[in-house]
């Protein structure tokens, strides 16, 4: 049943603008619990608690269209986590983020006990957040050795910022 699956798996879209549609952050995060049958007070409490857990306390009345890209991505994640899914499906969660926002996403994901399927081209990110890897070749999934997510220090030509992956 697709409805049952939607209640168990949270989807974080690549572009946060496609996921956020309410005027304020609190309304966006409370939308899911309201649709699950929570009262207004329960939905607001769950939303506020989730925002606090993600370091977004104080964002409740902020306008979603005025958030930075990283803030929008974190709020998108909050809209999913507030529903307490059994698993997460994340599509390119670090795409277009500044390094600080990327690190916040990594920090949040590393603390979650929730099973995750992450679609990403960012091997550094995958190395920090995942233990198993699959690659897509044509229409087939293939096990990727963890060596794809290797660890060594280097400097990217455009970033000129040493990091490990």
Predicted segments with their positions:
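Conserved ABC ATPase signature
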Residues: 63-67, 71
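ABC-family nucleotide-binding domains
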Residues: 98
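H-loop/switch region of ABC-family ATPase nucleotide-binding domains
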Residues: 120-121
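Hydrophobic anchor residue at the start of the ABC signature
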Residues: 77-78, 105
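Conserved ABC ATPase "signature" region
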Residues: 41-59
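Catalytic Walker B motif of ABC-type/P-loop ATPase nucleotide-binding domains
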Residues: 88-91
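Conserved beta-strand-loop-alpha-helix hinge in the C-terminal portion
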Residues: 138-165
């Amino acid at each position: 049943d697709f409805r049952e699956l939607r209640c168990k798996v949270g989807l974080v879209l690549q572009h946060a603008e496609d996921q956020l549609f309410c005027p304020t952050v609190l309304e966006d995060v409370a939308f899911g619990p309201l649709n699950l049958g929570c009262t207004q007070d329960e939905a607001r409490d769950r939303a506020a608690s989730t925002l606090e857990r993600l370091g977004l306390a104080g964002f409740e009345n902020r306008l979603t269209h005025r958030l930075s890209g990283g803030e929008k991505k974190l709020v998108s994640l909050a809209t999913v986590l507030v529903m307490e899914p059994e698993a997460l499906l994340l599509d390119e969660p670090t795409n277009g983020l500044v390094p600080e926002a990327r690190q916040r996403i990594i920090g949040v994901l590393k603390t979650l006990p929730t099973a995750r399927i992450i679609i990403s081209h960012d091997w550094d990110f995958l190395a920090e957040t995942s233990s198993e890897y699959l690659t897509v070749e044509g229409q087939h999934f293939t096990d990727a050795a963890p060596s794809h997510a290797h660890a060594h220090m280097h400097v990217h030509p455009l970033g000129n910022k040493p990091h490990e992956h």
